[in-house]
Design a protein with these regions (language model features):
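A generic alpha-helix propensity feature with a strong bias for hydrophobic helices
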Residues: 8, 66, 119-121
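Short, surface-exposed, charged/polar-biased interaction segments
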Residues: 32-36, 94, 98, 110, ...
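Short terminal alpha-helical segments
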Residues: 1-50
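Structured alpha-helical bundle/scaffold domains in large eukaryotic membrane-trafficking regulators
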Residues: 85, 113-121
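Positions within ordered alpha-helical repeat solenoids
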Residues: 20, 79-82, 111-114
């Protein structure tokens, strides 16, 4: 699969979406055609040439804290339980796992905001 030309911007947008509770609610309730479940959301975000491969590709060019936080984000996102682990969507969105992933994503969004695209450095 060919990497998207806007790979870095795509990664930033994916992480920003993970930090946004309202976006997640719209996604899960079907108001947006992003994902219909927590599992699909993770699969879309971590699939192909997005977050995990971007991290691997540019790992050595990233500041240490960002590198560590990105690694933790990818690991945590891949371990999120599927929707069947929760009684309701609200239980899912407010579970400790999802609260943690949103906090990580918020921190990453702030760190990535002014970071130049590593490929250009």
């Amino acid at each position: 699969m060919k990497r998207p030309p806007n790979w870095f911007d795509l990664v930033k947008e994916i992480i920003k979406d993970f930090s946004d509770l309202d976006h997640q609610k719209r996604s899960f309730y079907g108001d947006e055609f992003f994902a219909s479940s927590a599992a699909e959301m993770c699969a879309f975000a971590l699939d192909d040439y997005t977050v995990d491969e971007w991290l691997e590709t540019y790992y050595d060019k990233l500041p240490p804290r960002l590198r560590d936080d990105m690694t933790e984000f990818v690991e945590q996102a891949m371990e999120l339980p599927g929707d069947s682990a929760y009684d309701t969507i609200e239980d899912c969105l407010y579970s400790p796992e999802w609260v943690k992933i949103r906090a990580l994503a918020t921190s990453l969004t702030e760190q990535l905001e002014h970071l130049p695209d590593p490929k250009e450095s």
